[in-house]
Amino acid sequence: MFARTYFGEDRHRLIAFAGGGHVYNNYEDFLGSGVPVSTEGNAHVLAARYLYRVRAPWFLGVQAVDTNYLIFGENALSGEILERIGLTGFDSVGAGLVVSYDSRDDQNSPSSGFFGDANNVAYRESLGGEADFDVYRLTLKQYFPHGRGSVLLWALSNRWTRDAPPAGYSTLNLRGYVGGQYLGENMSSFQVEDRIRMGPRWGFAVFAGVACLYGGRESCGNAKDVYWSGGGGLYYVLKQRDKMVATLEYADGEGANRGLYMRFGWGL
């Protein structure tokens, strides 16, 4: 369940999320080890963020998150691998600060403007979690209109950790890869997407991106820690007034990594 509301002439923004599920994954190359691993997991997430516009287009705010993720192998070998690398899941509760810059012309389907978001989450046992560690994120996006309703954009995403257990490491933020299959202390990705409008409601998008895991034994200077992907798909405008869209995309990563995505909203 996702909720987003603005009030006070958009001086206040409140975002909340609650979700959970049972997840099955079959990895042909788990964490780049060449070993196939089958996992099963239970997860729930509660998160909330409040932003206050201090001066257009700047926002300051706070956020909190409560996650519970339990992962276990579907067979003895998978379970032993997960135990050895410490990927068994845990409860984590944290809070942090947010600084955001938002000059986009629309929240759902921007066609121009710039978006920047820097935030941290301090996970602490004193808040009810099982580990003390920190996560820092920086996201930048810029939109350029062209043609008749088409939009070109780029996006830079970063996630850094400090003292995080393996279950709290960063995963690839790149279409075409399964979340959690490749992990590192830190992650940075850069993506470019062109959304080509074909009519009042229909259009298609093409995209490409690169990501890197680094920190510890991983480095962006090592080719094995750099990941590429590309793809494309169709989009349909469900509500023209609100610029709500549905998308169907295919992304191809390295090796056997690929994915088909159907969602409400944009993938980037």
Regions found by a protein language model. Give the residues of each.
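Transmembrane beta-barrel strands of outer-membrane/channel proteins
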Residues: 16-30, 62-68, 114-122, 138, ...
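C-terminal outer-membrane beta-barrel translocator/porin domains of Gram-negative envelope proteins
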Residues: 84-88, 92-217
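A short pocket-lining beta-strand/turn micro-motif at the edge of beta-sheets
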Residues: 188, 200-204, 226-230, 240-246, ...
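Gram-negative/organellar outer-membrane beta-barrel architecture
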Residues: 1-91, 184, 243-247, 251-268
